[in-house]
Amino acid sequence: MVADPPKGDPKGYAAAEPTANGVSMLVPIEDVGSLKGGRCGSGDQVRRCLRANLLVLLTVVAVVAGVALGLGVSGAGGAFALGPARLEAFSFPGELLLRLLKMIILPLVVCSLIGGAASLDPSALGRLGAWALLFFLVTTLLASALGVGLALALQPGAAFAAINTSVGAPVEEAPSKEVLDSFLDLVRNIFPSNLVSAAFRSYTTSYKERLFNGTLVKVPTGGEVEGMNILGLVVFAIIFGVALRKLGPEGELLIRFFNSFNDATMVLVSWIMWYAPVGILFLVAGKIVEMENVGLLFASLGKYILCCLLGHAIHGLLTLPLIYFLFARKNPYRFLWGIMTPLATAFGTSSSSATLPLMMKCVEEKNGVARHISRFILPIGATVNMDGAALFQCVAAVFIAQLNHRSLDFVKIITILVTATASSVGAAGIPSGGVLTLAIILEAVNLPVHDISLILAVDWLVDRSCTVLNVEGDAFGAGLLQSYLDRTENCNSVPELIQVKSEMPLAALPVPGEEGNPLLKGCPGPAGDADTCEKESVM
């Protein structure tokens, strides 16, 4: 169905791509380029395209400039020449970006999940959750298998020379935790005992040595450590949203409150996005300057780094786009261009949770994912979908096995795959979370845990690549669910959202010839204008 052109002269109008509900809109020809994801022609259209993609370009340039600036400062003396005080001031703009993003994680995750869960009927909620978890499980298994295959093929640890203390970052003592205790900690964090403390603390098991019958015994002692328990908050928000829906009309006021709170948070996100290029530049540059000898580090661990980055590139540029193309029948690389800003932010911040606000905004405005999809799926994905971490952990496990001349039989390889897929959930979107859970995999296949100290030397780079792949998988999952709902709604024409009563009278429904996006009021175009249109949630 194509909307009617304006009365008068119909020349100079072309049909844009149909929206999710099958409506094509006639727009001026000069605007077609801006509607097709940034494909530009010449003249005014090029300038319009540059303005539309200015933030993306600035963010990508910031990453490149940060690498160049960091290498330049390192070549001029690095951290030793700057001194501690100047180095802290040099990295301060990046630290400020991290603080701004982390500031809005809590209200964004809680409000978006409560509103999303309350707005979906139970059957739709279960169906969406099941499809999302299936997608996350399959892609994580594929990433793990790819990591093991690349490590076995490239043999990154076969010709490795021992690293001395002058290489890379300071070597930290590798963490060690029993597999059972790690699983119990995961379950404990799913059900926090205090929601207030869960906003900034999580539960973990540590060990103390005690003398028992003349023998030193390692006794587990639990306690809380600094770090948001995002897994527990996600579970609580979903359950609370379902409970609000069960209340019926009595819970509608509270649902509207959480939706309004979430909209206000997204306004803050739109402001923070314009500071992101500056913060990313100094985050990347500051981390490179902190490294004592970048050249020696890459020479010693270059094959391991290459194996990890190559695996992330294959999974992110081939595997995930292929899955999206096969099931959604859309161009996956146009989808990737729409989330370029969150991907660059993920590289700079090295945190899936910190990238979540920008990812929500971009998938909704650039890639046409509905609000109730993105704000329900993306927080879950930031918690449980860790494709990059699973791939890196598999490469690291095989790398450490090769270092110690340990052979890996079929059973051990399967154990690595399954354990990496399961333990990646425990990373919970925190920086370097994958390294902390790598000890579980090494314990499962009886590999020495102390060799994790070698992985820590280059984790500053590999962890950033992991984060980019993690958030890309979350976005593709939301896009696939949007495509699935589009097909099922076209077949069944059953609305997924409940109607929330409002004191204000509802506007009349548009006639079929003027049908547009139902999430935007007063905008007849395919996606509306985010600057001039008033958003009205159907939740």
From Swiss-Prot:
It is found in: Cell membrane; Melanosome. The keyword rRNA processing does not apply. PROSITE patterns: NA_DICARBOXYL_SYMP_1, NA_DICARBOXYL_SYMP_2. InterPro entries: DAACS, Na-dicarboxylate_symporter, Na-dicarboxylate_symporter_CS, Na:dicarbo_symporter_sf. Na(+) 1 binds at G381, N385, N470, D474. GO terms for molecular function: antiporter activity; L-aspartate transmembrane transporter activity; L-glutamine transmembrane transporter activity; metal ion binding; neutral L-amino acid transmembrane transporter activity; symporter activity. Residues 518-539 are annotated as: Disordered. Keywords: Acetylation, Amino-acid transport, Antiport, Cell membrane, Glycoprotein, Membrane, Metal-binding, Phosphoprotein, Sodium, Symport, Transmembrane, Transmembrane helix, Transport. Na(+) 2 binds at T383. Residues 83-95, 155-223, 285-305, 400-412, 447-459 are extracellular. The modification Phosphoserine is found at S493, S502, S537. The chain crosses the membrane at residues 53-82, 96-117, 132-154, 224-247, 257-284, 306-327, 373-399, 460-481. Residues 333-363, 413-446 dip into the membrane without crossing it. GO terms for cellular component: centriolar satellite; ciliary basal body; melanosome; membrane; plasma membrane. This is Neutral amino acid transporter B(0). It comes from Bos taurus (Bovine). The gene is SLC1A5.
